[in-house]
Amino acid sequence: MGIKGLTALISDEAPGAIKEMEIKTYFGRKVAIDASMSLYQFLIAVRQNDGQQLMTESGETTSHLLGFFYRTLRMIDYGIKPMYVFDGTPPDLKKELLQKRFGRREEAREQEEEQKDVADAEKMDQLARRQVRPTRQHNEEVRHLLKLMGIPCVIAPSEAEAQCAELARAGKVYAAGSEDMDTLTFGTPILLKHLTASEQKKLPVHQVDLAKALEGLQMTMAQFIDLCILLGCDYLDPIKGIGPKTALKLIREHKTLENVVHHLKEDGKKSVQIPDHWPFQEARKIFESPDVQKGVDLDLKWEAPDVEAMVKFLCQDKGFSEDRVRKGCEKLQKSLSQKQQGRLDGFFTVKPGSAPPKRKAEDDKKNVKKKGKK
């Protein structure tokens, strides 16, 4: 889920913190990617023309393997050195959220069964995607594939995005790659969004700079963590009646969540409902002191790929086209064998504009309205 409304808030209050970049900008960079988020995305997005997941003849899902194989090749093609971090044991505070997700999947499964004779194909496809749940087998297969590709992997003690942030802070990688904005809350200096997006979508990479975000929001890291909790995160629901702008105003005025909660209780507005059990201190502790392996202790090594083992796994075991897999392996070998050139920062151009397209479009509309008033 990430942090509700955080991207829009940063776009409005700290537009210089978000830049649209071309993927080639990251030539020579090491990036820690949230594998658990990518796994979920690939299981949902990588589909056949009829909307069904890719499968072997025996019915085993292979969408996740196709996604990781080709998206990783794409990054390596651009000179990026990706490594992947997988989720470990979730914090106790996250169990309620996971139970809710399980409930939504069960609800979608029941709806699909009830409507299979009357619903249209689009509705059935939506219900099917809502039932997606990565399994232990999916995770193990992806780690096996990445090992054969020579790509380093780490299993985090707990949250993958927290471990990605730790690696970035330790200087082991340039940035963390994830779609979850809470990677910023865990303290990554640089967050890259859309790095593993499909090439067909032609999405630019959104680079978010934490220091610039804090500067624009006019707050410390501790206050930023409190803001993210107030907005709504994976560990606590937001307070009903408190939107992003109000949350920002409250943290700026009252500095801490303790003071904000005290103020809201004193204020007594009926439209604002603080849950009876809202352990924000526990959520804060997860963000401030996450369960991670120290970045300095991790030795990340990119190895030569095992082509024949990859062909056996993907083609003989999973039914992939051998011709396409071997061509992909040739690309992988070529990219990894080439001597890494040094980075010349500024050599590649940044795509114009510092805010995501949606925000820029909204700004353009506002400007048109202002001109009309003159």
From Swiss-Prot:
It is an enzyme of class 3 (hydrolase). Keywords: DNA damage, DNA repair, DNA replication, Endonuclease, Exonuclease, Hydrolase, Magnesium, Metal-binding, Mitochondrion, Nuclease, Nucleus, Phosphoprotein. One of its GO terms (molecular function) is 5'-3' exonuclease activity. Residues 103-122, 335-374 are annotated as: Disordered. Its cofactor is Mg(2+). Structure-specific nuclease with 5'-flap endonuclease and 5'-3' exonuclease activities involved in DNA replication and repair. During DNA replication, cleaves the 5'-overhanging flap structure that is generated by displacement synthesis when DNA polymerase encounters the 5'-end of a downstream Okazaki fragment. It enters the flap from the 5'-end and then tracks to cleave the flap base, leaving a nick for ligation. Also involved in the long patch base excision repair (LP-BER) pathway, by cleaving within the apurinic/apyrimidinic (AP) site-terminated flap. PANTHER family: FLAP ENDONUCLEASE 1, FLAP ENDONUCLEASE FAMILY MEMBER. This is Flap endonuclease 1. It comes from Mycosarcoma maydis. The lineage of its organism: Eukaryota, Fungi, Dikarya, Basidiomycota, Ustilaginomycotina.
